UniProtKB/Swiss-Prot annotation:
It comes from the Eukaryota. The gene is ASB7. The keyword Repeat applies. This is Ankyrin repeat and SOCS box protein 7. Residues 265-318 form the SOCS box domain. Transmembrane segments: none annotated. PANTHER family: ANKYRIN REPEAT AND PROTEIN KINASE DOMAIN-CONTAINING PROTEIN (PTHR24198), ANKYRIN REPEAT-CONTAINING PROTEIN-RELATED (PTHR24198:SF165). SUPFAM superfamilies: Ankyrin repeat (SSF48403), SOCS box-like (SSF158235). Probable substrate-recognition component of a SCF-like ECS (Elongin-Cullin-SOCS-box protein) E3 ubiquitin-protein ligase complex which mediates the ubiquitination and subsequent proteasomal degradation of target proteins. Plays a role in spindle dynamics and genome integrity by targeting the mitotic progression protein PSRC1 for proteasomal degradation in a cell cycle-dependent manner. Also participates in meiosis by mediating the proper attachment between kinetochores and microtubules. Pfam families: Ank_2 (PF12796), SOCS_box (PF07525). CDD domains: SOCS_ASB7. Belongs to the ankyrin SOCS box (ASB) family. Keywords: ANK repeat, Repeat, Ubl conjugation pathway.
Length: 318
């Protein structure tokens, strides 16, 4: 029946023929049909052009031919408003992406947003395509674009536990304190101590509270009775006297759960009773003065290595 329908509809027959050629990587047939006048910008029922199709299938040579014959990479499909670059990001097709990014359309596609406000960088971070993330940033993609829900690529990488993408984005100065400190609080809530340590080492603000209740990372550590997180936060300068919207300090939160002895409660009682020593106060202040984006330059300071290591918290017993 389909064959009969195709015979009566030559346009559909041509569409299926060129799609089959792309799927098979038959560049000769693709080129021949384009030279005979077939448009590379025709769209199927899903709004896909041949560029969408070949990018998703990983057919690099076909992508090159389509671009040579005027394919438009700015076209968005009808599924989610995705460009061919979004699909290349989804499947990690970095070589194909480079072809599109080296075209005259680069500025129009590199930060193009889907119907949900996702850029190709959102997609690459979500799927953990670290080489693709690097490529987009090499071509100067915006590092902190916001989706319609206010989410950045870094947040997606954290939630999906894409560690390599997280590090790459942070190395390119992604905002570690986005959404009033979401990342550090998320790491605490998930008891992800490696992320928690990474964010603190890179200068995350320890005292930013949730907008809905004012709970800081230290409050959340108390709620979870996570003494390791609490120690890390305290060592990096978390204020034990910060209050949530109910007027509770982290210690008060810990006591409200249970007054009986527990590791986190015992620790909070200990550090709340006595002030920080001058040495630790100096470290906290120096790191603040150096600033978030310059902490990675600590090694360039004209000071003794032991001081650099101290500023990096290398002697912490956690």
């Amino acid at each position: 029946m389909l064959h009969h329908h195709c015979r009566r509809n030559p346009e559909l027959q041509e569409e299926l023929q060129i799609q089959a050629a792309v799927a098979a990587g038959d560049v000769h047939t693709v080129r021949k049909m384009l030279e005979q006048g077939y448009s590379p910008n025709g769209r199927d029922a899903n709004g896909w052009t041949l560029l969408h199709f070949s990018a998703a299938r990983g057919k690099e040579r076909c992508v090159r031919v389509f671009l040579e014959h005027g394919a438009d990479p700015t076209v968005k499909d009808l599924i989610g408003g995705f460009t061919a670059l979004h699909y290349a990001a989804m499947h990690g097709r970095a070589r194909i992406a480079r072809l599109m990014l080296e075209s005259e359309y680069r500025s129009d596609i590199i930060n193009a947003k889907s119907n949900d406000g996702w850029t190709p960088l959102h997609v690459a971070a979500h799927y953990g395509r670290d080489s693709f993330v690097r490529l987009l940033l090499e071509f100067k993609a915006e590092v902190d674009p916001l989706s319609d829900k206010g989410t950045t690529p870094l947040q997606l990488a954290i939630i999906r536990e894409r560690s390599s993408c997280v590090k790459i984005l942070l190395d390119h100065n992604a905002n570690i304190d986005i959404q009033n400190g979401f990342l550090l609080r998320y790491a605490v809530i998930k008891s992800n101590h490696s992320y928690c340590r990474m964010f603190l080492q890179r200068g995350a603000d320890t005292d930013l509270g949730r907008l809905e209740d004012g709970q800081t990372p230290l409050h959340l550590s108390a709620l979870r009775d996570d003494v390791l997180c609490a120690r890390m936060l305290y060592n990096y300068g978390a204020d034990t006297n910060t209050r949530n919207y109910e007027g509770q300090t982290p210690l008060a939160v810990s006591i409200s759960i249970s007054g009986s002895s527990r590791p986190c409660l015992d620790f909070l009682q200990e550090v709340t009773r006595q002030p920080r020593n001058l040495q630790d106060l100096c470290r906290i202040k120096i790191r603040q003065c150096i600033g978030l984006q310059n902490l990675k330059l600590l090694d360039e300071l004209p000071i003794a290595k032991v001081m650099k290591d101290y500023l990096k918290h290398k002697f912490d017993d956690i």
